[in-house]
Amino acid sequence: MFSKCIWMEKAKEKPSEFFKSTKTSLKSILKHPEINTRKINDVVIKAHKIVIHTLQFLKMYILHHYQTQSQIIPIIDKILILNVMKVVCGEKHTNQGRLPKKETLELIENLTSFYIEHYKPHTQPEQLDYEYMSNVLSYLCEDIMTMYENNIQLHYVDYVERFVNVVWKKKMMVEKIRKIFPTKKEREARVRQLEKELRKIKNDLLNVDSNVDYTSHPHYHKWITQQKKCILPNKKFQKQSIYYDLKCKPMDYLPCMIAMMKQVENDEETISNVFPLRSSISPGYIRLDTITLVYLLLRKEQGKKRDYCNQGNTKKHEDKIWKFFFRTEKKVFRKNGFSFHHMISTDGVGVSILFIREDLVGKRLPSAKKGVSKELYIDELNDYSKLQDKKVIGIDPGKSDLIYCVDDASKNANVFRYQPHGTQTKTPRA
């Protein structure tokens, strides 16, 4: 009885996720596909082209600003991205809506001037517009901001490591070691020593805690202090941790990444792309909400669009609107503990149906806390005492072996393999 009560209490617990999604094909849920599929595909392709031009324009605009404004870049936010989208599309067909603020008008004028002078001469002429796509553009702005933030959070440390390797000529030093030392054992020892030395330099560069001393050789300390002014933002770091601060305010690190890659480029080495671009010819997913459906799919004989978009009618009739265009009675539109959020993501072929937790329907969502994950990689730990008595297992996923495990680095290590056909093998390494 006691265990049953515990089980019932766990069953009542709210899911940790605010949203969930279910993926299916667009044709399986869309009504009147002979008419509506083409309309949705047109918007998907148009949005894909807008994103391509927006990302390219942003790269050119930010680099130009960096080079002409003393290594200062413009504030990259949704307002800038949205206005870039509008500039690359040209004039809007309809003039409905309130006038932009004075600051926005000045920004648009500046972006338009840059577009005509610098961007347009280097691109193929392409007719784009964003008629009835205001909400779609807003969602795309969020996606582009996420692209920039993810790129910085995931790769900033890699850029620092690349920068150190290039400045201190790691590639050339390794080649010299391989030529000078005759035996393999000596070569490997010298390379390990070099890598250990460079690792200490990288750690010192990434250390923002003033109470922690440098660990590298004193010969490098002056250089490290000088380079920190270029490759770290001039600010107070959250919790004295660069990894935590990267999660909180990643955009502060973009000028630093540009500076590092400029130095790598000057040394005629291969650079990494600081700016996210879209090179795929396959369109990406776009989000469609209720009001976008009305503007895109509602025909004249079915009613006036403004009747569904004024006086709160969009919210009042959202179930009716979605039922009119989609087969919402299907099981795929239901999920236990969640309610259909009246929003989908689609690339014209596949579709992801978005669900929101039932207790959050119609409410303001709790703010998600930004910060580093509680889980750390083993090389990020400061205290290894708890691992001393544990058996360490190395796991490597792959294609031929879904999982490959070893318990030692020697030839006598035990190996556990799980292959695609489902057979498990446990053998000592030969």
Residue ranges of each PLM-predicted region?
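Nucleic-acid substrate recognition interfaces
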Residues: 1-430
